[in-house]
């Protein structure tokens, strides 16, 4: 019984599999919120299309990490895991010129 209680408590209080939520198009603006992110190696970032579609995430010099498919629907979401230490600049391809750019610090 104690094992079952411990298991259920662990599942109930389990954290999401990602480290950070990032809103794409936050508050009606062409921005990532937050735009500067600190995570540990192996952690994931959860990107959510908040509004003003379409959005995607291109990670500079890392096509294997990029999510180039466009998220058209508000609420559409995806995760990107960053396995190695380093600084990763990312942007939304359709809105890079408008300043929709961010950076991930993995350490």
For the regions a language model picked out, list residue spans one by one:
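Extracytoplasmic copper-binding redox domains, predominantly the cupredoxin/blue-copper superfamily
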Residues: 17-107
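Positively charged n-region of N-terminal signal peptides that target proteins for export
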Residues: 1-5
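Cleavable N-terminal signal peptides
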Residues: 6-7, 17
């Amino acid at each position: 019984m104690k094992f079952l209680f411990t298991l259920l408590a662990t599942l109930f209080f389990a954290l999401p599999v990602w480290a950070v939520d990032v809103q794409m198009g936050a508050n009606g603006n062409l921005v990532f919120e937050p735009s500067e992110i600190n995570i540990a190696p192996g952690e994931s970032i959860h990107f959510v299309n908040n509004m003003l579609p379409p959005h995607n995430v291109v990670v500079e010099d890392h096509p294997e990490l990029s999510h180039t498919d466009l998220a058209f629907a508000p609420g559409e979401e995806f995760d990107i895991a960053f396995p190695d230490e380093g600084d990763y600049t990312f942007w939304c391809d359709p809105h890079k010129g408008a300043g929709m750019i961010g950076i991930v610090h993995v350490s």
